[in-house]
A protein has these predicted regions:
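Short, small-residue-biased leader/transition segments that mark boundaries at the very start
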Residues: 1-3
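N-terminal signal-anchor transmembrane alpha helix
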Residues: 10-36
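Transmembrane alpha-helix interface/packing and boundary motifs in multi-pass membrane proteins
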Residues: 20-24, 105-115, 147-154
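Cytosolic, membrane-interface loops and tails of multi-pass inner-membrane proteins
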Residues: 31-66, 200-211
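Short, non-helical or kinked segments that cap or interrupt transmembrane helices
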Residues: 38-50, 113-126, 153-161
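Interfacial segments of multi-pass membrane proteins
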Residues: 54-61, 87-90, 107, 121-151, ...
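Nucleotide and nucleotide-moiety/phosphate-recognizing core
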Residues: 60, 68-74, 78-112, 144-145, ...
Length: 211
């Protein structure tokens, strides 16, 4: 049986669908609506991610904003991890695990429940990286934390942290454990692509800080 046959077994396809659908759950949107009564898709950057949840809710309830922001980060990261861990427990190949990771990030960024709108993919990407390439992911998280504290610009900090993950994975692990680094690059590309509006605002000097 060729590798493509193994890649597209019935059980694998079910995992791929589950990864995308679970990744599509818009936790930031749901939390902000439930606990703050606001629709983050209609305010701020209109993203469903933690940064926009924090920014929008902070306007009326700063203490709640921090709690919802943290909860959004954690839930967005966890939703990328859940299907991965189940697949790992069943002995799925690294190629299959990376496909699941890519689809989880795609689900967050292009949610099936929101007309294929979504967030920027940072927390979900970090979640899957922590499972598949933990040390590079931890380095990237540390770089992100440092940059966030110094620069106070979420988008820039996230992208710098993401680049740190990629560089660390290449040098520490000699890649991601499969024949190609393509899955890691695809996730990186998706996240960068979703940040294009932020990059444009940054160039114009209009990107907001999150303090």
């Amino acid at each position: 049986m060729c590798s493509s046959d193994l890649f597209f077994t019935n059980s694998n396809v079910l995992f791929y669908i589950a990864a995308y659908l679970v990744g599509s759950i818009p936790f930031g949107l749901l939390l902000a609506k439930q606990f703050a009564g606001v629709n983050v898709q209609e305010a701020g950057s209109k993203s469903i991610g933690a940064t926009n949840v924090l920014r929008v809710v902070k306007q009326t309830n700063p203490s709640l904003a921090k709690k919802l922001g943290i909860a959004t980060v954690l839930l967005d990261a966890i939703k990328g991890v859940v299907v991965l861990l189940i697949a790992m427990s069943m002995g799925m190949s690294q190629e299959t695990l990376w496909a699941i990771a890519v689809l989880a990030v795609l689900g967050h960024c292009y949610s099936a429940y929101l007309g294929f709108e979504g967030g920027k993919g940072v927390a979900t990407g970090l979640g899957v990286f922590l499972v598949l390439i933990p040390m590079p992911a931890l380095i990237g998280a540390a770089v992100w934390g440092f940059c966030a504290k110094v620069l106070k610009v979420s988008s820039v900090s996230s992208l710098i942290g993401l680049v740190a993950v990629v560089i660390a994975a290449i040098f520490m692990n000699d890649g991601v454990g499969v024949d190609s680094n393509a899955p890691m690059y695809i996730i990186t590309f998706i996240i960068f692509y979703k940040h294009i509006p932020n990059i444009v605002r940054l160039i114009k000097g209009e990107e907001s800080k999150v303090v």
